Amino acid sequence: MEKPTIILATSNGVGMGHLARASAVALALKEVANPIIVSMAGGIAEIPDFMGIRCEYIPGKDRMWMSREKWDVYLRDRLLALAEETNAKVLSFDGVIPYPGVIAAKNANPDLKLVWVRRGLWQKKPQRFVLGLQSAMMDKVIEPGDIARAYDFGPTATRKEAVLTAPVSLFRKEDAMTREEARKALGLDLNRPTVLVQLGTGEGDVNEKMTAALSGLLGWKDLQVILTKAPVDKDGKSLAPEGLDLKVARYFPLAKVLHAFDAGICATGYNGVHELLPAQVPTVFVSNIRGTDDQEARARWCNDFGFALRADQADLADITAKVKMLQDPAVRQRLSAKCAELPDTTGGQEIANMLYQLATAPKGKKSSGLTYKRLLVQDRISRGSRHVIMLGLRRLALVYRFLHPHIKVQEIDQAPPVFGEQATAAELHPLIKSSTRFEHLISGASASYRKRREEIAFAAYGKETVITKTK
C-alpha cells in the first residue's frame, strides 16, 4: 500500500515550539507516511538537513509583501496547490489560531482532512472568543500534553473537543549525544562547566532581562556560556557584562546536544520546558509574557514542584539572584534528580498515529458552510477598527483621484520572485532572510506545480502602484 502524504503546517510563533512539535510528529510518521512540513518560521531551513523530509517555506503576513486579504487567499492557494501536487490526505496545523487561509483550504477542498494541533495554557486573550467556531471546522483537534497542565486555567482548559496526548518533544534519551559527544559537536571544552542561555533580545525590557540573567553567571569559575543568539541590542551594543566567556552556537535540533550543559537559562515556552527538563538540565526559567502562551503558569508549576527555578520576570534583581543559585552544585544536583520523575514525552508518536488513521480513513468530516461564514464574519470583526479605517482611506483615495484627474496612477510589474527547490540550511537561510521575495518549492516539484505556483504568486504580488503628477 502506498504511503499517504500528510502536510504538517505551522505558524511563525514566538520561539521554535510549533516547528519543533511538527518535527517530532514528522519523525514519528516517516515509517508509515510521507510527511511534508510547511511553515512561516525561518527555522524551517534546518529541517531538510536534519530530517531528510521535504518542506516548503511560506512567507508570513509579517513580511508585508501583500495586503492581509491577499495573504489569506495566497496561503489558501499555496496549501491547496501543495495538497494537489502531493495527493495529501491530511493537513495538520500547529498554531495558536488557524489562519483564515488554512480554514479556507478545507472549505474549498472538503476531502482534505483538517487537524488543529492546539497547545494549551492560553492566556485570556481575545482569540478565545472564536475557539468554538474554529474547532467546529476541524476533523480533529489535538492538544499536545503539557507537564504543567494542572496550572492551566485558560480558555482551552475546560473545552471538550480536543484529544489530549502526552507531551511532545524532540528530546529522546535514546538519540541524545553523550556529554562528550555533544561538547565536541558544539566545539566546547570537554571539562569546563557550561551553561546554555536561550533568551530573546529586542525590546528594552527583554534586553534588560538578558543582561540580568548573564550577570548571575559572573564569578562561576572557568565557565563557558553558550547562547543561541548574540546578546546584542538592535544597534549592535552588547548586553553581556564584562568577564564572561561567551559563544554563540547554532545546532538543530538542540535537543540532541543538551547533555553538553551543566545548567540552562530559558524562556518558559513549551519547547524549552519539554526539552531541557526531560534532559535533566538544571534550569532557571524567565518567562516571556507576550503572546498567547501562559509562560508564567508553566514556570510556577515547574518551580512549585521542584523541577526548575522560576525567576520573577518583572524583577531584574530576582532574575540575577535565581541564576546565581545555579552556581551551587547541590542545587543543580537536586533539580536534575527531580527531573528524572517527569513522564515520557511520547506525544509526537501519539499524534502521528492519529494523523495516519485519518489519512487512511475513507472520508473526512464535512464542515458546515454556515459555520464557515460565521467564522469569516467574526474574523472581520476581530480585525477591529484598524481594518475599517484602512477600508475608509482606500475609498477616500478613489474619490480624491476622481476629483483630481491631474494625478495619474500607473501600475508596473514588480520584480518577479525567486523560485527554488533549495534543501539545505546554507542555501535556505539567506533566501528566507532576504528582502527578495522567495517562493520555495518542495524538492521534485512537477512542471505543472511550478506553473500553478507562478500563477499564485502573480495574483498575490500583482503590480506596483506608482503615482505621477502631470499638468
Regions found by a protein language model. Name each.
Residues F305-R310, A314-V331:
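C-terminal "capping" alpha-helix adjacent to the active site of nucleotide-linked donor transferases
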Residues F93, Y251-A297:
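A donor-sugar binding/catalytic signature common to diverse glycosyltransferases
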Residues A9-R21, G204-V206:
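A short, glycine/small-residue-rich beta-strand->loop->alpha-helix junction that serves as a flexible
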Residues L80-I97, E439-S443:
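Short N-terminal targeting/anchoring amphipathic segment
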Residues M177-A263:
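Donor-nucleotide binding loops and adjacent catalytic segments primarily
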Residues Q327-H406, Y461, K471:
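C-terminal amphipathic helix plus adjacent low-complexity
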